[in-house]
Structures are given as structure tokens and as C-alpha cells.
Amino acid sequence: MRSRKSLPPLPPEQACLPWHPPGLVAGVDEAGRGPLAGPVVAAAVILDDLNPIEGLNDSKKLTAARREALYDEIRAKALCCSIAEASVEEIDRLNILQATLLAMRRAVLGLRLKPVLVLVDGNQLPVLDVQAEAIVKGDSLVQAISAASILAKVTRDRWCERLHEQYPEYGFDGHKGYGTAAHLAALRLHGACEEHRRTFAPVAHVVSIARMAEPLAAARVAAAAQGAQALLLSA
């Protein structure tokens, strides 16, 4: 009797997932959990099996130019897609995890077609009224999640480039809001802008120092005014 050889495992990238029920499947991912500034952005994508997109992968593994090209192709070829965000105010009020899940929920609710299954990158699920499953490293394993990661990343990067025009002193077009040495140095020099997340430790530290310095600065201004008045009276 011939022995049966075991089949080789599927490659780790873009594996076919056999548990999908029949119907539309949406992939969901986010961008912007780690940065010190700006919203967290989420995207939901339902791909068209009859209109495949070559080169989908985790957005972090792609160059900026490749992400931009795929962004346009995804928007053109997907059955539907939706992009949503949670604001800086919501991040500071809810915390970054809950704000991320809120953005994901908004993205799914924004789809014009309702999926029967939602596949979410990571190990946490937003509150949804459809079946959902969290997949660790899903942005490398599931094409729809890869597509969502690209839409979310490009959308947030474009937001950072617009923010740079408003606040060029922080260099948002380069670090995209992440806590690089250059960004932290700009924070210390210029303080926090309106788009910085006050509950994130580096920003909270800068804000607290600024608040402690306010009474001292006010006292110096008052003393200078009193000195000027005294000089006028003595003249």
C-alpha cells in the first residue's frame, strides 16, 4: 500500500480561506493607531472576484508610489468600498482602541452593499450586525483586508500632507504623525497643535509643561508691566 504524502502548506500570503459563507465578504483594516496626531482611519472593501487586482499586500510592505497606484485601482475595481475615521477628540475621549473600533464600524456601515461576513485585521472586533471574524496579520493573508489597509493608509498619509501645509513646523509630511525624534523635538519647541492627541504620553508631557509655565510667564509679564509703570511715575 502506497503511503500518502502530505500536501505542502499554503503560502502565508493571500491564502484562500475555506470558511467563507456564500455571499459578499468585506475586509476591514485601519491606519493611524500609533501616531501622536490626527484621526485614526479605517476602510472596508468588498472585492470583485471577476475583476482581480494584482499585487495586493499589507500596505506597510508596499512603497508609497505602489500604494497610490493600488489605491486608484481598488477604488475602480472593487464592488464597493468605504473609508471612515474617528477624530482626535474621539481618540482622547474614548481611547485609541475604542476609537479604532468605532472607525471600523463606520466604514462597514458606509458600504452600499451589505456583506454576509466581515474579516477584520487584528484580534479585536467592532460592534456589527453581521458575522465578523478577527484575523491576526489579515492584511497579509486576505486580499480584501490588504485592499482596506491600502485605502486607509493612503487616506491618512494624504491627510498628513494637508496638515503639513497648515503646520509646516512639525514636519507631518515626513513622519506622518509618528513619534520620531524630529517630531518630538518639534513638539518641545512649538508645543502641541490642535491635531495632537492629548492623551498620548509625549503630547501630554509637553502640554503639562506648557501649563506649568503659564503662571510663571504671566507673573513675568505682570512684573514687567509694573516696572514700566514705576518708571513712568518716576519720570
Curated annotation (Swiss-Prot):
<dbReference type="InterPro" id="IPR022898">
    <property type="entry name" value="RNase_HII"/>
</dbReference>
<keyword id="KW-0464">Manganese</keyword>
<dbReference type="GO" id="GO:0003723">
    <property type="term" value="F:RNA binding"/>
</dbReference>
<dbReference type="GO" id="GO:0005737">
    <property type="term" value="C:cytoplasm"/>
</dbReference>
<feature type="binding site">
    <location>
        <position position="30"/>
    </location>
    <ligand>
        <name>a divalent metal cation</name>
    </ligand>
</feature>
<dbReference type="GO" id="GO:0043137">
    <property type="term" value="P:DNA replication, removal of RNA primer"/>
</dbReference>
<dbReference type="InterPro" id="IPR036397">
    <property type="entry name" value="RNaseH_sf"/>
</dbReference>
<feature type="domain" description="RNase H type-2">
    <location>
        <begin position="23"/>
        <end position="212"/>
    </location>
</feature>
<dbReference type="GO" id="GO:0030145">
    <property type="term" value="F:manganese ion binding"/>
</dbReference>
<dbReference type="GO" id="GO:0006298">
    <property type="term" value="P:mismatch repair"/>
</dbReference>
<dbReference type="Pfam" id="PF01351">
    <property type="entry name" value="RNase_HII"/>
</dbReference>
<feature type="binding site">
    <location>
        <position position="121"/>
    </location>
    <ligand>
        <name>a divalent metal cation</name>
    </ligand>
</feature>
<keyword id="KW-0540">Nuclease</keyword>
<dbReference type="InterPro" id="IPR024567">
    <property type="entry name" value="RNase_HII/HIII_dom"/>
</dbReference>
<keyword id="KW-0963">Cytoplasm</keyword>
<keyword id="KW-0479">Metal-binding</keyword>
<feature type="binding site">
    <location>
        <position position="29"/>
    </location>
    <ligand>
        <name>a divalent metal cation</name>
    </ligand>
</feature>
<dbReference type="InterPro" id="IPR001352">
    <property type="entry name" value="RNase_HII/HIII"/>
</dbReference>
<keyword id="KW-0378">Hydrolase</keyword>
<protein>
    <recommendedName>
        <fullName>Ribonuclease HII</fullName>
        <ecNumber>3.1.26.4</ecNumber>
    </recommendedName>
</protein>
<dbReference type="InterPro" id="IPR012337">
    <property type="entry name" value="RNaseH-like_sf"/>
</dbReference>
<keyword id="KW-0255">Endonuclease</keyword>
<dbReference type="GO" id="GO:0032299">
    <property type="term" value="C:ribonuclease H2 complex"/>
</dbReference>
<comment type="similarity">
    <text>Belongs to the RNase HII family.</text>
</comment>
<comment type="function">
    <text>Endonuclease that specifically degrades the RNA of RNA-DNA hybrids.</text>
</comment>
<dbReference type="GO" id="GO:0004523">
    <property type="term" value="F:RNA-DNA hybrid ribonuclease activity"/>
</dbReference>
